[in-house]
Amino acid sequence: MESEKDIGAKFLGDYRILYRKGQSLWSEDLLAEHRFIKKRYLIRLLLPDLGSSQPFMEAFHDVVVKLAKLNHPGILSIENVSESEGRCFLVTQEQDIPILSLTQYLKSIPRKLTELEIVDIVSQLASLLDYVHSEGLAQEEWNLDSVYIHILNGVPKVILPDLGFASLIKERILDGFISDEENRESKIKERVLLHTSEGKQGREDTYAFGAITYYLLFGFLPQGIFPMPSKVFSDFIYDWDFLISSCLSCFMEERAKELFPLIRKKTLGEELQNVVTNCIESSLREVPDPLESSQNLPQAVLKVGETKVSHQQKESAEHLEFVLVEACSIDEAMDTAIESESSSGVEEEGYSLALQSLLVREPVVSRYVEAEKEEPKPQPILTEMVLIEGGEFSRGSVEGQRDELPVHKVILHSFFLDVHPVTNEQFIRYLECCGSEQDKYYNELIRLRDSRIQRRSGRLVIEPGYAKHPVVGVTWYGASGYAEWIGKRLPTEAEWEIAASGGVAALRYPCGEEIEKSRANFFTADTTTVMSYPPNPYGLYDMAGNVYEWCQDWYGYDFYEISAQEPESPQGPAQGVYRVLRGGCWKSLKDDLRCAHRHRNNPGAVNSTYGFRCAKNIN
């Protein structure tokens, strides 16, 4: 670990450098903390010689634009791209646990990987490559250290940290191999075995994927005429031959375009063929001819009642080389056991009859079908609600923006409103129920990198200490969808303003005519736990500050003029471009916290200051 003096800069833009983590072939990796929000990030500072190359920077810019749109646990998500003192740097999520390259991970395990462990790693890599190929990106430049394994709670997760960038620094990678005198030969050979000569985007990845899978199975890369997995691992249940041949085909057009479907189990027929092959090769043994053995014995040794096998019986026995018998019970199986040479003729006849009865019986084979287990869906955590009595109220203000005029009367029916904004622990259950961060119309519900909810190892988790904080990074679609999921709705703009003012006409802030930092969370560095500040006259918490709250209405600049003419339960314009947000947030100034202050944004907009609370009709 190096100190800040070793790095040569205490701050890099808005980020305070904590220490240097290492250096890759194209970046210097630093751990930093944002000076305002106090959150840690991994900064990848571009090396000076690369930053001065105009062709490289143009290609680098194109890759960054594509990567910024991706959202996959196997890719280091880009939070921000900035420049300081002429050096470009990327801001990515902090990795708390060390990351091992694939070869380092395999060396750390004192045994060979099991088939299911190989399936897990290969499935993750295939899913990741299929995803990036669909987005127009590819790894292209491969070696065994291109794949990294992130150990999270003892579970290996596959990551490609240099995805998109490796192809930009091919010459630098080759120079690195040549300068490494100790491992030069093995590294160059490894690169040759992982690449083809076609150079078509995506097909290089397909070939390398097949070669890496082969390496996980055998411990070496395929070269020349190599053995197929079925010849060595006959007891494996997955069809590795199909995957290897689909990826390592000599003809580029025959290589698979999608990788994940290649990971499949063997068919029932293939498994049966393996069983029969194993039986024939390992279970059969030479049985001496009882006729010959009896002929070689003296006549005095032959027991009374024994008869020699006729020529016809011997002939039929030569044709019967192997018989596979399925017994329906243990008793029947025991009946077919080979009797000792001392068995009587009656016992041999009983054995023949038992064997014949098994052979003529219709075999019955039933397929095992695992009973489906219906997993219980997550249940919502409901919020206590406050009843807002209906009546005539005043809304608007003369001290704000033009869209707050005119001050006018509105008539509202009684309704319920949540006492606090929806929290992370409540919203995560909605995401688990949806199974995605998008709704059925592909509208984004939440952007995880702008929230305190993360997806790790395929599971959604909340950052420690943020379960009771209001959910942020949520779109209007996510807020509306959550409300519908629990049988509620979003409040209208009129309902929200009247609820914030506590029913008091012309009240400036929810807590009174003035507001201090002891009364609300504003102009700070982050959200706070809900209900941390005193409630307003209605008993509602966080109506000022903490997070902006989505409302049901479309925003209309002059809608108050229409509302003054039609005061009965106003609900905003019939259509529009923006949806209404109210209440100010943790980084707002005082003016944004006024009860009458209006804010708006696109319904699909994502921000670390946007949250919501729910309302409900009386009936």
From Swiss-Prot:
GO molecular function, one term: formylglycine-generating oxidase activity
Active site as annotated: 141
Residues in Protein kinase domain copies: 15-302
Domain of life, per lineage: Bacteria
Catalytic activity, as annotated: L-seryl-[protein] + ATP = O-phospho-L-seryl-[protein] + ADP + H(+); L-threonyl-[protein] + ATP = O-phospho-L-threonyl-[protein] + ADP + H(+)
Name of one Pfam family that matches: FGE-sulfatase
SUPFAM superfamilies, A to Z: C-type lectin-like (SSF56436), Protein kinase-like (PK-like) (SSF56112)
Gene3D superfamilies found in the cross-reference section: paralog of FGE (formylglycine-generating enzyme), Phosphorylase Kinase, domain 1, Transferase(Phosphotransferase) domain 1
Record's comment on post-translational modification: Autophosphorylated on serine and threonine residues.
Matches recorded under PANTHER family: FORMYLGLYCINE-GENERATING ENZYME, SULFATASE MODIFYING FACTOR 1, 2
Protein name according to UniProt: Serine/threonine-protein kinase pkn1
Organism annotation: Chlamydia pneumoniae
